[in-house]
Amino acid sequence: IDGVAMSRSLKPIPNKHVQHLFGRPELNGLDGELIVGDASAEDVYTQTTSGVMSIEGRPDVSYWVFDDFTEDGGFARRFHTAYRRIKKQMACEDVPHHTVNNQAELLKYEQDYLELGYEGIMLRCPDGPYKQGRSTAREEFLLKLKRFVDAEAKIIGFTEQQTNTNEAVRNE
């Protein structure tokens, strides 16, 4: 927005390198996700958060673009516009999209991405409007298909130890 790379909560991304790469007016209006390293890596969230939230450093970051909220019309039209806008941009990737026509194709598509290491897939209505934030199941504009449950826990206490009894390991 206004030549500044922003987070989902509309706060500027702190990393100077990320701002240099993606905080440019020609990328205004694009919606996507910053990824540090391999997009299907098990620790991609941790690596990305660490890379983009550190002010200094040059993370191996790319911008995976999946929408353009400056374009009117349904998703298919907006994505086509986004793709045209990023195809010559350094470190920008378009998120692959595939049309599925039935449940069998959907299950195959999901299985293919699970085998690549992704945690699930996103389903989109090709004519759906842009919506900032999350779509509801009732709207059916954008749905997440992730077949496992993850959770967060609150730490309610700890006991500090005076020695490290962990097995010694070498970081290769």
At which residue positions do the language-model features occur?
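Amphipathic alpha-helical
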Residues: 97-160
